[in-house]
Design a protein with these regions (language model features):
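Structural signature of tandem-repeat unit edges
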Residues: 1-2, 11-25, 35-48, 58-71, ...
Length: 188
């Protein structure tokens, strides 16, 4: 069962969501712009969170994602600017472009140990992140330039408070502009 595209888009009365384990996919913009949504629990039955699913949910503070999710779609949590922490389950292999871009207060990120692909700008402009640990499973950062917008940087571009970057032993990542605009980096 899929939560259809834009099904609850702009429903400001929704404050908490605990999806049942019959749901397998959260559609594009399903809960986009639900301004008062503050807590989301995603069960292990969900394998994909589509693009913009929770974008611009400005009240979102707490997301619990269980094992089972394989892909987090583009801009899925774009501009969820009250979000402080995110734990990406180890089942996640791919995070598409700008999934968490503009989450201004996001401080702590735990990436999946099985993550292989991260799209451009995934954590772009997350100005509160101070430390990131890159797992050795990660093989590709999509550092795509341009596309007619100002998205001219890699996954962590514009994370101005980023101070420490740790690459897990065995990492073999090469990517253009991965940390472009991260002028606070002190330790690699």
């Amino acid at each position: 069962t899929i939560v259809c595209a834009a099904l609850f888009m702009g429903c400001d009365g929704i404050e908490e969501i605990e999806l049942p384990d019959t749901i397998t996919e959260i559609g594009d913009s399903a809960f986009k712009s639900c301004k008062n949504l503050n807590k989301v629990i995603i069960p292990e039955s969900v394998t994909k969170i589509d693009g913009d699913a929770f974008a611009e949910c400005s009240g979102l503070v707490d997301i619990k994602m269980h094992e089972g999710i394989n892909t987090i779609g583009s801009r899925a949590f774009y501009k969820c600017d009250r979000l402080l922490d995110i734990v990406i389950p180890d089942s996640v292999e791919k995070i598409e472009f700008e999934a968490f871009r503009g989450c201004d207060k996001l401080e702590n990120i735990k990436l999946s140990e099985n993550l292989t692909i991260v799209g451009y700008g995934v954590f772009g402009d997350c100005k509160s992140i101070s430390k990131i640990e890159i797992p050795k499973s990660l093989k590709k950062f999509d550092g795509t330039w341009g596309r007619g917008t100002n998205l001219s940087y890699g996954a962590f571009g514009g994370c101005s408070n980023l101070k420490t970057v740790n690459f897990e032993a065995g990492s073999t990542i090469v990517c253009a502009a991965l940390f472009m605009g991260c002028d606070g980096i002190e330790e690699i």
